[in-house]
Protein backbone atom coordinates (compact mmCIF):
# COMPACT_ATOMS: atom_id res chain seq x y z
CA UNK A 1 0.00 0.00 0.00
CA UNK A 2 3.03 2.24 0.19
CA UNK A 3 4.10 4.34 -2.76
CA UNK A 4 7.67 5.53 -3.18
CA UNK A 5 6.36 8.68 -4.90
CA UNK A 6 4.31 9.75 -1.87
CA UNK A 7 5.29 13.18 -0.61
CA UNK A 8 5.12 13.39 3.18
CA UNK A 9 4.74 16.95 4.47
CA UNK A 10 5.82 17.86 8.02
CA UNK A 11 2.16 18.13 8.99
CA UNK A 12 1.41 14.67 7.60
CA UNK A 13 4.42 13.25 9.44
CA UNK A 14 3.10 14.66 12.69
CA UNK A 15 -0.20 12.81 12.20
CA UNK A 16 1.68 9.65 11.22
CA UNK A 17 3.83 9.81 14.36
CA UNK A 18 0.82 10.32 16.61
CA UNK A 19 -1.07 7.45 15.01
CA UNK A 20 1.95 5.15 15.16
CA UNK A 21 2.07 5.85 18.88
CA UNK A 22 -1.65 4.99 19.14
CA UNK A 23 -1.17 1.73 17.23
CA UNK A 24 1.79 0.76 19.41
CA UNK A 25 -0.25 1.36 22.56
CA UNK A 26 -3.16 -0.68 21.20
CA UNK A 27 -0.85 -3.54 20.27
CA UNK A 28 0.69 -3.45 23.73
CA UNK A 29 -2.79 -3.46 25.31
CA UNK A 30 -3.71 -6.56 23.31
CA UNK A 31 -0.52 -8.35 24.37
CA UNK A 32 -0.57 -7.26 28.02
CA UNK A 33 -4.31 -7.54 28.68
CA UNK A 34 -6.58 -8.98 25.99
CA UNK A 35 -4.43 -12.02 25.16
CA UNK A 36 -4.71 -13.07 28.81
CA UNK A 37 -8.53 -13.09 28.76
CA UNK A 38 -10.65 -16.18 28.32
CA UNK A 39 -12.64 -16.64 25.11
CA UNK A 40 -15.95 -15.48 26.64
CA UNK A 41 -14.42 -12.24 27.91
CA UNK A 42 -13.03 -11.44 24.47
CA UNK A 43 -16.41 -12.21 22.89
CA UNK A 44 -18.16 -9.86 25.33
CA UNK A 45 -15.70 -6.95 25.29
CA UNK A 46 -13.50 -7.19 22.20
CA UNK A 47 -11.39 -4.03 22.10
CA UNK A 48 -14.17 -1.71 23.27
CA UNK A 49 -13.08 -0.50 26.70
CA UNK A 50 -14.58 1.53 29.52
CA UNK A 51 -12.01 4.22 28.74
CA UNK A 52 -13.15 4.36 25.10
CA UNK A 53 -16.76 4.62 26.15
CA UNK A 54 -16.27 7.39 28.70
CA UNK A 55 -13.70 9.45 26.79
CA UNK A 56 -15.19 9.18 23.31
CA UNK A 57 -18.79 7.94 23.38
CA UNK A 58 -20.51 9.53 26.39
CA UNK A 59 -20.27 6.32 28.40
CA UNK A 60 -22.17 4.06 25.99
CA UNK A 61 -21.79 0.47 27.21
CA UNK A 62 -22.57 -0.93 23.76
CA UNK A 63 -20.40 -0.07 20.76
CA UNK A 64 -21.96 2.94 18.95
CA UNK A 65 -23.44 2.58 15.48
CA UNK A 66 -21.85 5.11 13.12
CA UNK A 67 -24.53 5.76 10.49
CA UNK A 68 -22.32 8.09 8.49
CA UNK A 69 -20.99 7.71 4.97
CA UNK A 70 -17.73 9.53 5.54
CA UNK A 71 -15.28 11.06 7.97
CA UNK A 72 -14.26 14.71 8.34
CA UNK A 73 -10.62 15.76 8.82
CA UNK A 74 -8.92 18.51 10.78
CA UNK A 75 -6.90 19.79 7.82
CA UNK A 76 -5.39 18.84 4.45
CA UNK A 77 -2.43 17.09 6.07
CA UNK A 78 -4.65 14.70 8.01
CA UNK A 79 -6.78 14.04 4.92
CA UNK A 80 -3.73 13.39 2.75
CA UNK A 81 -2.24 11.02 5.33
CA UNK A 82 -5.55 9.20 5.70
CA UNK A 83 -6.22 8.75 1.98
CA UNK A 84 -2.65 7.55 1.46
CA UNK A 85 -3.34 4.91 4.15
CA UNK A 86 -0.56 6.28 6.32
CA UNK A 87 -2.80 6.57 9.38
CA UNK A 88 -5.62 4.24 10.54
CA UNK A 89 -8.70 6.36 9.90
CA UNK A 90 -11.84 5.07 8.23
CA UNK A 91 -12.34 7.67 5.46
CA UNK A 92 -15.51 6.35 3.83
CA UNK A 93 -17.97 3.61 4.82
CA UNK A 94 -17.42 1.69 1.59
CA UNK A 95 -13.87 1.16 2.88
CA UNK A 96 -14.30 1.06 6.66
CA UNK A 97 -16.34 2.37 9.57
CA UNK A 98 -15.74 2.61 13.35
CA UNK A 99 -18.59 0.15 13.99
CA UNK A 100 -17.13 -2.45 11.62
CA UNK A 101 -13.72 -2.01 13.25
CA UNK A 102 -15.07 -3.28 16.58
CA UNK A 103 -16.68 -6.23 14.79
CA UNK A 104 -13.42 -7.03 12.97
CA UNK A 105 -11.22 -6.73 16.03
CA UNK A 106 -13.45 -9.09 17.99
CA UNK A 107 -13.59 -11.73 15.26
CA UNK A 108 -9.84 -11.54 14.69
CA UNK A 109 -9.25 -12.16 18.39
CA UNK A 110 -11.77 -15.02 18.56
CA UNK A 111 -10.38 -16.84 15.50
CA UNK A 112 -6.86 -16.20 16.79
CA UNK A 113 -7.60 -17.40 20.32
CA UNK A 114 -4.77 -19.70 21.40
CA UNK A 115 -2.68 -18.82 18.34
CA UNK A 116 0.82 -17.46 18.99
CA UNK A 117 0.82 -15.11 16.00
CA UNK A 118 -1.32 -12.15 14.97
CA UNK A 119 -4.65 -12.30 13.16
CA UNK A 120 -6.60 -9.55 11.42
CA UNK A 121 -10.10 -9.41 9.95
CA UNK A 122 -11.91 -7.83 7.01
CA UNK A 123 -15.69 -7.56 7.35
CA UNK A 124 -17.92 -8.28 4.36
CA UNK A 125 -21.61 -7.92 3.57
CA UNK A 126 -22.18 -11.70 3.42
CA UNK A 127 -20.50 -15.08 3.61
CA UNK A 128 -20.39 -15.31 -0.19
CA UNK A 129 -18.67 -11.91 -0.31
CA UNK A 130 -16.19 -13.24 2.25
CA UNK A 131 -15.33 -16.21 0.02
CA UNK A 132 -14.75 -14.02 -3.04
CA UNK A 133 -12.75 -11.57 -0.93
CA UNK A 134 -10.52 -14.43 0.27
CA UNK A 135 -9.84 -16.12 -3.07
CA UNK A 136 -9.73 -13.21 -5.53
CA UNK A 137 -6.27 -11.83 -4.57
CA UNK A 138 -4.64 -15.15 -5.45
CA UNK A 139 -6.22 -15.32 -8.91
CA UNK A 140 -4.55 -12.29 -10.46
CA UNK A 141 -2.93 -12.52 -13.89
CA UNK A 142 0.81 -12.00 -13.44
CA UNK A 143 2.15 -12.54 -16.96
CA UNK A 144 -0.36 -12.89 -19.82
CA UNK A 145 -4.18 -13.06 -19.76
CA UNK A 146 -4.00 -16.60 -21.14
CA UNK A 147 -1.79 -17.96 -18.35
CA UNK A 148 -3.30 -21.07 -16.73
CA UNK A 149 -4.66 -20.66 -13.22
CA UNK A 150 -6.25 -23.24 -10.95
CA UNK A 151 -7.11 -23.95 -7.35
CA UNK A 152 -8.08 -27.09 -5.43
CA UNK A 153 -11.26 -27.30 -3.32
CA UNK A 154 -13.35 -29.84 -1.45
CA UNK A 155 -16.40 -30.98 -3.43
CA UNK A 156 -18.33 -31.21 -0.16
CA UNK A 157 -19.26 -27.57 0.24
CA UNK A 158 -22.14 -25.12 0.42
CA UNK A 159 -24.17 -24.81 -2.79
CA UNK A 160 -23.34 -21.12 -3.18
CA UNK A 161 -19.64 -21.91 -2.93
CA UNK A 162 -20.02 -24.59 -5.60
CA UNK A 163 -21.72 -22.05 -7.88
CA UNK A 164 -19.14 -19.35 -7.25
CA UNK A 165 -16.29 -21.71 -8.07
CA UNK A 166 -17.83 -23.71 -10.92
CA UNK A 167 -19.78 -20.93 -12.69
CA UNK A 168 -18.30 -17.54 -11.78
CA UNK A 169 -14.67 -18.66 -11.79
CA UNK A 170 -14.52 -21.72 -14.07
CA UNK A 171 -17.10 -20.95 -16.74
CA UNK A 172 -16.96 -17.15 -16.77
CA UNK A 173 -13.26 -16.55 -16.11
CA UNK A 174 -11.65 -19.83 -17.22
CA UNK A 175 -10.02 -20.39 -13.81
CA UNK A 176 -10.04 -24.12 -13.14
CA UNK A 177 -11.41 -25.49 -9.88
CA UNK A 178 -10.08 -28.98 -9.23
CA UNK A 179 -12.52 -30.76 -6.94
CA UNK A 180 -11.32 -33.13 -4.23
CA UNK A 181 -13.93 -35.87 -3.76
CA UNK A 182 -12.37 -37.48 -0.67
CA UNK A 183 -10.97 -34.69 1.47
CA UNK A 184 -9.44 -37.20 3.91
CA UNK A 185 -7.18 -38.53 1.13
CA UNK A 186 -4.01 -36.44 1.16
CA UNK A 187 -2.78 -38.11 -2.03
CA UNK A 188 -5.87 -36.87 -3.87
CA UNK A 189 -5.18 -33.31 -2.71
CA UNK A 190 -1.55 -33.62 -3.79
CA UNK A 191 -2.43 -35.08 -7.19
CA UNK A 192 -4.46 -31.96 -8.05
CA UNK A 193 -1.66 -29.48 -7.35
CA UNK A 194 0.74 -28.19 -10.01
CA UNK A 195 2.88 -25.09 -10.60
CA UNK A 196 -0.24 -23.07 -11.53
CA UNK A 197 -2.24 -23.90 -8.39
CA UNK A 198 -2.93 -20.70 -6.44
CA UNK A 199 -4.46 -22.03 -3.19
CA UNK A 200 -6.22 -24.92 -1.45
CA UNK A 201 -9.77 -24.43 -0.17
CA UNK A 202 -11.76 -26.58 2.23
CA UNK A 203 -15.06 -26.38 4.09
CA UNK A 204 -15.30 -28.14 7.44
CA UNK A 205 -17.59 -29.38 8.78
CA UNK A 206 -19.21 -29.30 5.36
CA UNK A 207 -22.79 -28.27 4.69
CA UNK A 208 -24.86 -30.47 4.55
CA UNK A 209 -22.81 -33.70 4.42
CA UNK A 210 -20.83 -33.05 7.63
CA UNK A 211 -17.54 -34.16 6.12
CA UNK A 212 -14.17 -33.23 7.60
CA UNK A 213 -10.46 -33.26 6.75
CA UNK A 214 -7.11 -33.10 8.53
CA UNK A 215 -6.41 -29.35 8.67
CA UNK A 216 -2.78 -29.61 9.74
CA UNK A 217 -1.92 -32.20 7.09
CA UNK A 218 -3.58 -30.22 4.29
CA UNK A 219 -2.01 -26.97 5.54
CA UNK A 220 1.43 -28.60 5.56
CA UNK A 221 0.81 -29.86 2.02
CA UNK A 222 -0.22 -26.39 0.85
CA UNK A 223 2.82 -24.78 2.43
CA UNK A 224 5.15 -27.35 0.88
CA UNK A 225 3.93 -25.98 -2.48
CA UNK A 226 4.19 -22.37 -1.19
CA UNK A 227 0.46 -21.73 -1.43
CA UNK A 228 -2.11 -20.89 1.28
CA UNK A 229 -4.90 -22.98 2.78
CA UNK A 230 -8.27 -21.21 3.04
CA UNK A 231 -10.89 -22.77 5.33
CA UNK A 232 -14.61 -22.12 5.68
CA UNK A 233 -15.44 -23.06 9.27
CA UNK A 234 -18.84 -21.36 9.43
CA UNK A 235 -20.57 -24.43 10.87
CA UNK A 236 -18.12 -24.81 13.77
CA UNK A 237 -17.56 -21.13 14.65
CA UNK A 238 -14.42 -20.22 16.63
CA UNK A 239 -16.14 -21.58 19.75
CA UNK A 240 -15.46 -25.13 18.49
CA UNK A 241 -12.73 -24.85 15.85
CA UNK A 242 -10.05 -22.29 14.97
CA UNK A 243 -8.25 -23.50 11.80
CA UNK A 244 -5.52 -20.84 11.94
CA UNK A 245 -4.15 -22.46 15.10
CA UNK A 246 -3.77 -25.69 13.11
CA UNK A 247 -1.93 -24.17 10.16
CA UNK A 248 -4.60 -22.60 7.94
CA UNK A 249 -3.74 -19.18 6.53
CA UNK A 250 -7.22 -17.72 6.06
CA UNK A 251 -10.66 -18.45 7.53
CA UNK A 252 -13.94 -17.32 6.00
CA UNK A 253 -17.08 -17.04 8.08
CA UNK A 254 -20.66 -16.61 6.99
CA UNK A 255 -21.42 -14.61 10.12
CA UNK A 256 -25.06 -14.73 9.01
CA UNK A 257 -25.22 -18.26 10.41
CA UNK A 258 -24.35 -19.35 13.96
CA UNK A 259 -22.43 -16.20 14.89
CA UNK A 260 -25.59 -14.13 14.23
CA UNK A 261 -27.94 -16.73 15.68
CA UNK A 262 -30.81 -14.26 16.09
CA UNK A 263 -31.26 -14.19 12.31
CA UNK A 264 -31.19 -10.39 12.25
CA UNK A 265 -29.22 -9.89 9.07
CA UNK A 266 -26.54 -11.00 6.63
CA UNK A 267 -22.82 -10.63 7.38
CA UNK A 268 -19.45 -12.17 6.60
CA UNK A 269 -15.80 -12.01 7.56
CA UNK A 270 -12.32 -12.96 6.36
CA UNK A 271 -9.78 -13.62 9.11
CA UNK A 272 -6.13 -14.17 8.22
CA UNK A 273 -2.87 -14.82 9.96
CA UNK A 274 -0.18 -12.22 9.38
CA UNK A 275 2.69 -13.30 7.11
CA UNK A 276 0.75 -16.03 5.33
CA UNK A 277 2.22 -18.37 2.73
CA UNK A 278 1.91 -17.60 -0.99
CA UNK A 279 4.47 -17.63 -3.80
CA UNK A 280 2.05 -15.68 -6.01
CA UNK A 281 1.40 -12.63 -3.82
CA UNK A 282 3.30 -9.45 -3.06
CA UNK A 283 4.89 -8.93 0.33
CA UNK A 284 2.32 -6.40 1.58
CA UNK A 285 -0.56 -8.78 0.85
CA UNK A 286 1.18 -11.62 2.67
CA UNK A 287 2.16 -9.41 5.61
CA UNK A 288 -1.42 -8.37 6.45
CA UNK A 289 -3.86 -10.02 4.06
CA UNK A 290 -7.10 -8.86 5.71
CA UNK A 291 -6.05 -5.21 5.92
CA UNK A 292 -4.72 -5.25 2.36
CA UNK A 293 -7.92 -6.61 0.80
CA UNK A 294 -9.99 -4.24 2.92
CA UNK A 295 -8.17 -1.08 1.83
CA UNK A 296 -7.47 -1.98 -1.80
CA UNK A 297 -9.53 -4.78 -3.36
CA UNK A 298 -12.74 -4.26 -1.39
CA UNK A 299 -12.48 -0.49 -1.67
CA UNK A 300 -12.95 -1.02 -5.40
CA UNK A 301 -15.49 -3.88 -5.28
CA UNK A 302 -17.58 -2.44 -2.44
CA UNK A 303 -18.73 -5.52 -0.44
CA UNK A 304 -18.36 -3.83 2.94
CA UNK A 305 -20.60 -4.54 5.92
CA UNK A 306 -23.26 -2.04 7.05
CA UNK A 307 -22.38 -0.48 10.44
CA UNK A 308 -25.81 -1.29 11.90
CA UNK A 309 -25.40 -4.94 10.96
CA UNK A 310 -21.87 -4.97 12.38
CA UNK A 311 -23.07 -4.03 15.87
CA UNK A 312 -26.13 -6.31 15.71
CA UNK A 313 -23.93 -9.28 14.77
CA UNK A 314 -21.37 -8.28 17.36
CA UNK A 315 -24.02 -8.46 20.08
CA UNK A 316 -24.99 -11.98 18.94
CA UNK A 317 -21.36 -13.11 19.12
CA UNK A 318 -21.02 -12.33 22.81
CA UNK A 319 -22.66 -15.60 23.89
CA UNK A 320 -21.48 -17.82 21.02
CA UNK A 321 -19.60 -20.31 23.22
CA UNK A 322 -22.57 -20.99 25.51
CA UNK A 323 -24.95 -21.29 22.56
CA UNK A 324 -22.72 -23.67 20.64
CA UNK A 325 -22.32 -25.83 23.73
CA UNK A 326 -26.06 -25.99 24.37
CA UNK A 327 -27.05 -26.63 20.77
CA UNK A 328 -24.25 -29.15 20.18
CA UNK A 329 -25.43 -31.20 23.16
CA UNK A 330 -29.00 -31.10 21.89
CA UNK A 331 -27.90 -32.13 18.40
CA UNK A 332 -25.99 -35.10 19.78
CA UNK A 333 -29.10 -36.32 21.59
CA UNK A 334 -31.26 -35.92 18.48
CA UNK A 335 -28.69 -37.61 16.22
CA UNK A 336 -28.44 -40.61 18.54
CA UNK A 337 -32.20 -40.99 18.63
CA UNK A 338 -32.66 -40.69 14.86
CA UNK A 339 -29.84 -43.17 14.31
CA UNK A 340 -32.10 -45.93 15.62
CA UNK A 341 -35.41 -44.65 14.19
CA UNK A 342 -37.10 -47.23 11.93
CA UNK A 343 -38.00 -44.58 9.30
CA UNK A 344 -34.44 -43.23 9.03
CA UNK A 345 -31.94 -44.71 6.60
CA UNK A 346 -28.83 -42.94 7.92
CA UNK A 347 -27.70 -40.02 10.05
CA UNK A 348 -24.81 -37.69 9.24
CA UNK A 349 -23.36 -36.12 12.38
CA UNK A 350 -19.70 -35.91 13.32
CA UNK A 351 -20.47 -36.65 16.95
CA UNK A 352 -21.69 -40.18 16.18
CA UNK A 353 -18.96 -42.83 16.52
CA UNK A 354 -20.07 -44.48 13.26
CA UNK A 355 -19.46 -41.31 11.21
CA UNK A 356 -16.43 -41.97 8.94
CA UNK A 357 -14.67 -38.80 10.13
CA UNK A 358 -15.69 -38.98 13.80
CA UNK A 359 -12.20 -39.80 15.03
CA UNK A 360 -10.63 -37.10 12.87
CA UNK A 361 -13.15 -34.46 13.94
CA UNK A 362 -12.56 -35.42 17.57
CA UNK A 363 -8.94 -34.28 17.20
CA UNK A 364 -10.00 -30.78 16.23
CA UNK A 365 -13.48 -29.94 17.52
CA UNK A 366 -13.42 -28.94 21.18
CA UNK A 367 -15.56 -26.57 23.21
CA UNK A 368 -13.15 -23.73 23.84
CA UNK A 369 -12.15 -23.24 27.51
CA UNK A 370 -14.26 -26.18 28.75
CA UNK A 371 -11.41 -27.04 31.12
CA UNK A 372 -12.09 -23.79 32.98
CA UNK A 373 -15.83 -24.47 33.35
CA UNK A 374 -17.06 -25.62 36.74
CA UNK A 375 -19.49 -27.89 34.86
CA UNK A 376 -16.75 -29.77 32.96
CA UNK A 377 -13.30 -29.05 34.43
CA UNK A 378 -11.74 -30.83 31.44
CA UNK A 379 -11.59 -30.55 27.64
CA UNK A 380 -14.79 -31.77 25.96
CA UNK A 381 -15.60 -32.44 22.32
CA UNK A 382 -18.48 -30.61 20.71
CA UNK A 383 -19.50 -31.20 17.10
CA UNK A 384 -21.84 -28.31 16.31
CA UNK A 385 -25.56 -27.99 15.73
CA UNK A 386 -25.80 -29.05 12.08
CA UNK A 387 -26.77 -32.60 11.14
CA UNK A 388 -28.46 -34.38 8.25
CA UNK A 389 -30.46 -37.57 7.94
CA UNK A 390 -31.72 -39.64 5.03
CA UNK A 391 -35.30 -40.90 5.05
CA UNK A 392 -36.20 -44.44 4.01
CA UNK A 393 -38.48 -44.55 0.98
CA UNK A 394 -36.86 -42.04 -1.37
CA UNK A 395 -37.46 -38.43 -2.39
CA UNK A 396 -41.27 -38.45 -2.24
CA UNK A 397 -41.34 -39.91 1.26
CA UNK A 398 -38.69 -37.37 2.32
CA UNK A 399 -40.86 -34.48 1.15
CA UNK A 400 -43.77 -35.96 3.08
CA UNK A 401 -41.72 -35.99 6.28
CA UNK A 402 -40.54 -32.46 5.62
CA UNK A 403 -44.07 -31.17 4.96
CA UNK A 404 -45.34 -32.69 8.22
CA UNK A 405 -42.92 -30.80 10.47
CA UNK A 406 -44.81 -28.58 12.91
CA UNK A 407 -42.31 -27.07 15.34
CA UNK A 408 -39.22 -27.10 13.12
CA UNK A 409 -39.16 -24.28 10.56
CA UNK A 410 -38.92 -25.11 6.85
CA UNK A 411 -36.30 -22.68 5.49
CA UNK A 412 -32.95 -22.58 3.73
CA UNK A 413 -31.32 -20.82 6.68
CA UNK A 414 -29.13 -22.38 9.35
CA UNK A 415 -27.45 -21.35 12.58
CA UNK A 416 -30.61 -19.97 14.11
CA UNK A 417 -31.66 -19.99 17.74
CA UNK A 418 -34.77 -21.71 16.31
CA UNK A 419 -34.49 -25.16 14.71
CA UNK A 420 -34.61 -25.05 10.91
CA UNK A 421 -34.72 -27.82 8.29
CA UNK A 422 -34.45 -28.03 4.53
CA UNK A 423 -34.09 -30.58 1.74
CA UNK A 424 -30.76 -29.57 0.14
CA UNK A 425 -31.50 -31.26 -3.20
CA UNK A 426 -34.44 -28.92 -3.84
CA UNK A 427 -33.10 -25.80 -2.10
CA UNK A 428 -29.56 -24.88 -1.09
CA UNK A 429 -27.90 -27.26 -3.55
CA UNK A 430 -30.49 -27.55 -6.34
CA UNK A 431 -28.65 -25.11 -8.63
CA UNK A 432 -25.59 -27.32 -8.94
CA UNK A 433 -27.58 -30.06 -10.69
CA UNK A 434 -27.81 -33.80 -10.16
CA UNK A 435 -24.23 -34.45 -11.25
CA UNK A 436 -22.86 -31.81 -8.90
CA UNK A 437 -24.94 -33.14 -6.01
CA UNK A 438 -23.75 -36.68 -6.71
CA UNK A 439 -20.16 -35.45 -6.65
CA UNK A 440 -20.81 -33.73 -3.33
CA UNK A 441 -22.71 -36.67 -1.82
CA UNK A 442 -26.15 -35.05 -1.50
CA UNK A 443 -28.99 -37.53 -2.18
CA UNK A 444 -32.60 -36.55 -2.83
CA UNK A 445 -33.76 -38.19 0.43
CA UNK A 446 -31.53 -36.06 2.69
CA UNK A 447 -33.00 -33.58 5.19
CA UNK A 448 -30.62 -31.06 6.71
CA UNK A 449 -31.47 -30.09 10.28
CA UNK A 450 -29.91 -27.23 12.19
CA UNK A 451 -30.84 -27.63 15.84
CA UNK A 452 -31.71 -24.51 17.82
CA UNK A 453 -31.96 -23.76 21.51
CA UNK A 454 -35.32 -25.45 22.12
CA UNK A 455 -35.42 -28.42 24.46
CA UNK A 456 -34.25 -31.41 22.39
CA UNK A 457 -37.19 -33.54 23.54
CA UNK A 458 -39.59 -31.16 21.80
CA UNK A 459 -37.59 -31.29 18.57
CA UNK A 460 -37.46 -35.09 18.75
CA UNK A 461 -41.22 -35.24 19.26
CA UNK A 462 -41.75 -33.13 16.14
CA UNK A 463 -39.37 -35.28 14.09
CA UNK A 464 -40.99 -38.49 15.32
CA UNK A 465 -44.53 -37.38 14.46
CA UNK A 466 -43.40 -36.18 11.01
CA UNK A 467 -41.59 -39.45 10.26
CA UNK A 468 -44.58 -41.51 11.38
CA UNK A 469 -47.13 -39.32 9.59
CA UNK A 470 -45.37 -39.88 6.28
CA UNK A 471 -45.38 -43.71 6.50
Each model region followed by its residue ranges:
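Conserved PLP-enzyme active-site core in the AAT-like
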Residues: 2-43, 48-56, 110, 116-342, ...
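Conserved C-terminal alpha-helix-loop-beta "cap" of PLP-dependent enzymes
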Residues: 45-55, 344-447, 451
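A glycine-/small-polar-enriched, mobile loop at the entrance of the PLP active site in fold-type I
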Residues: 55-56, 62-109, 300
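Short loop segments at secondary-structure junctions
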Residues: 70, 272-277, 391-394
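Alpha-helix N-cap recognition
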Residues: 74-76, 111, 126, 455
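Short amphipathic alpha-helical segments
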Residues: 88, 119, 266, 308-309, ...
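Hydrophobic side chains in well-ordered alpha-helices
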Residues: 134, 397-401, 459-463
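Well-ordered alpha/beta subsegment
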Residues: 440, 444, 452-467
Amino acid sequence: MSNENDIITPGMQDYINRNNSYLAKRSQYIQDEVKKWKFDTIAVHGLYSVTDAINDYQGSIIEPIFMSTSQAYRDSDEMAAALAYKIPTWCYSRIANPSTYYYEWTLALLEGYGFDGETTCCSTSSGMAAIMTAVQPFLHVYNTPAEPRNFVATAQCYGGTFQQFSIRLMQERNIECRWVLDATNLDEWNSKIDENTRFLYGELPSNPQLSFFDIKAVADLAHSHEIPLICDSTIATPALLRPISHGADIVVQSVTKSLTSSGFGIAGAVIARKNLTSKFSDDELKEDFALNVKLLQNRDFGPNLHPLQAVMSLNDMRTIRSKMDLMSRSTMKIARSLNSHPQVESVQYLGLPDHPQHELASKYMWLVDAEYDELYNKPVNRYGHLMSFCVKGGAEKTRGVFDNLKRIWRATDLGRIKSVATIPAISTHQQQGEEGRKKAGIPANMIRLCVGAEHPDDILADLDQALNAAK
